Amino acid sequence: MAYQGSGSHSPPHYDDNGHRLQDLPHGSYEEEASRGLLSHQQGPFTGPFDDPQQHGSSTTRPVSGYSLSETYAPEAAYHDPYTQPSPGSVYSAQSAENPAAAFGVPGRVASPYARSDTSSTEAWRQRQAPGGGPGGLRRYATRKVKLVQGSVLSVDYPVPSAIQNAIQAKYRNDLEGGSEEFTHMRYTAATCDPNEFTLHNGYNLRPAMYNRHTELLIAITYYNEDKTLTSRTLHGVMQNIRDIVNLKKSEFWNKGGPAWQKIVVCLVFDGIDPCDKDTLDVLATIGVYQDGVMKRDVDGKETVAHIFEYTTQLSVTPNQQLIRPTDDGPSTLPPVQMMFCLKQKNSKKINSHRWLFNAFGRILNPEVCILLDAGTKPGPKSLLSLWEAFYNDKDLGGACGEIHAMLGKGWKNLINPLVAAQNFEYKISNILDKPLESSFGYVSVLPGAFSAYRFRAIMGRPLEQYFHGDHTLSKQLGKKGIEGMNIFKKNMFLAEDRILCFELVAKAGSKWHLTYVKASKAETDVPEGAPEFISQRRRWLNGSFAAGIYSLMHFGRMYKSGHNIVRMFFLHIQMLYNIFSTVLTWFSLASYWLTTTVIMDLVGTPSDNNGNKAFPFGKTATPIINTIVKYVYLGFLLLQFILALGNRPKGSKFSYLASFVVFGIIQVYVVIDALYLVVRAFSGSAPMDFTTDQGVGEFLKSFFSSSGAGIIIIALAATFGLYFVASFMYLDPWHMFTSFPAYMCVQSSYINILNVYAFSNWHDVSWGTKGSDKADALPSAKTTKDEGKEVVIEEIDKPQADIDSQFEATVKRALTPYVPPVEKEEKTLEDSYKSFRTRLVTFWIFSNAFLAVCITSDGVDKFGFTNSATDRTQRFFQALLWSNAVVALFRFIGACWFLGKTGLMCCFARR
């Protein structure tokens, strides 16, 4: 809920003017996301659970009265939509300019900082030094921290007072005496491989330390998303956890302890270098991260992952509003157990999942793991719906929900044809493809951006095969790892989620199946530009094709599973369906060209079947235009191979954009021709090749044996007609009106541009890791032995007041409105060279092709040539022979001249 402060608890420079607490109705996600939450007591602590000293902090720490009492974001004032806004609820001009002025935080000019190459990164590096902060380096007292088993560094750090104060007293009262769950953040420097992160080696996690059963482990994998995308996912997850905690009649969640203690959220960041440092400020604001605590190595042994743990009730919305609890209403967020794993180096998503499953999963032993990508926002009760599918089906091994494109406010993103086409593609996949595969029991792909697995179902061979794609295991696995794979297998692991799905269903001795949960929905952002779209689909298409072939080749392993005869029967049907689909995909390039030419010839070439008429430009102009369209189609198709074999999509942005436009125009032209064909067929204005006056039986027989317009009508009805019918059956038809036209325009580009680029770059598997120099900013941990001969390290001991003052600056940075970075459109020197090469090769090929077509093709006779192709070929051949003869004669004359000149010079040369 959002609240601007009230009564005596407000900062002195605010006038509340009777502003009251706004209770949000349960489930009003959009309203809640637009409100900032800002109310808590200030000044001295009012109870024993408000004082951090009561929870194990150092007794020498002075009491801080700091609390989260305002939103730091400008323009954050909330206006009640049902009442007139009161003057006191709106910030003064001074507050709007510098909302943190009440806490002594200087104003900061917003700048388009982002990701890993600008000033925010440099500032982050400076804050990692011991004692580093807004005031520069300081010298603090130190404390000695004993290492677990003499090698594992695991330290508890006090969280800022404001974060402690945000936890509701009823949760703190329920904790065991001496617990530091809400008062301290736990940091562990993991200097081992994920497989070695075990209790035996001294590593542990808080939920296991508190002897809690983990039913649901929610994982968010992250690469370099900005703080808005990350907040969108994290806030959506916390709202979903609230849905679960608020269940009143649950037979499961309300037994054996509070529901929130059975849920763990794990964020896995793939490397310090690509990570957006502003996102770390958001995590620090909710208490799950702190600057200056990470260690680059422990006694020279490099840290592989930095693990933070904290249980928080705070959240930050995508528009940088701080949400915290104020009452016991249904809209209040419950405590959420969070783990934040920041890998030191970028080592790809499969390695992130290895940390999740092999390291954290084996310690927590969850029943269900839900996987999300940063930027994917789960809808209301989506995670609950996914979990319920597992709870109600003991043989369910994996599930996924519906992913739809993020359309923006008022569906404004649909103005972009690429976004609209992808929206239609996602919708039809969720209406036709996923339900079909779910009926068979084998969903070929559970998207990594939004899916769930039963942990014990994927343990063993499924995860073992899945992790063969982790390049950090290449030396350990040898020939079975990435280094020993051929190019086909490497492409297969570009769609690693498909491998996991197949291995799960084919698991020996088990009868796990996969399903699609329609009630579970999530939205994700999709590429809006042609280069990004092409690059994304290159990985998807190559990976899915290779993984599909893999599943067909290894289908025999299904016989070792525990599926019953009915399930096996349907799995065989699905296998035949997949084979048929693969064949159609393989020949799609030729199929699209033939479909285009056949339809244009049926309506554009005058014949007895169409009454010697031609549509749409008349029988004289239409054949000429159709011929031009065919040559343009083939020309741009050839261009795709030239571009794909030598250029990056970002380096040929204009060429690809032009290709999308040209193929879109041709597609519209063909659709108009097809509709005209259908209209003529049913209007009776043209003879058809099926009978309508000899009964239903004869009609169906002639209709389905049709070889002309009838078969085209069948194809149109079987695709477009079914799209409409199925969409209305699922009560979700809007994409047919908002996105279907755009999809029709882009449909041919899916084949002619995306498939060509993907297959032409089959060699690009992008397995290399990026270098990481950001870890150099982290300090090292050196151990010593104390008087008791125990291995310890010396760690700084910050006063609570300094922790709070540094936190003020952190919150200010986190809640500063996000400014998207300005992407540089400049081409690299290599891109410029490749572009020139592409233009040169394109001009050379097309000019030669143009000459060959003009000479040999009968189709150009329509352009007014007075002679036939045979005559033109004969004359060209004559001209070519004469030209070669003239050139040879010219060369001979030159040789004779040189020989004569040399002879004369020999006669008169001085010796």
UniProtKB/Swiss-Prot annotation:
It holds the Pfam family Chitin_synth_1N. Residues 54-66 have a biased composition (Polar residues). Its main location: membrane. This is Chitin synthase G. The keyword Lipid biosynthesis does not apply. One of its GO terms (biological process) is cell wall organization. Its EC number is 2.4.1.16. It comes from Aspergillus fumigatus (strain ATCC MYA-4609 / CBS 101355 / FGSC A1100 / Af293) (Neosartorya fumigata).
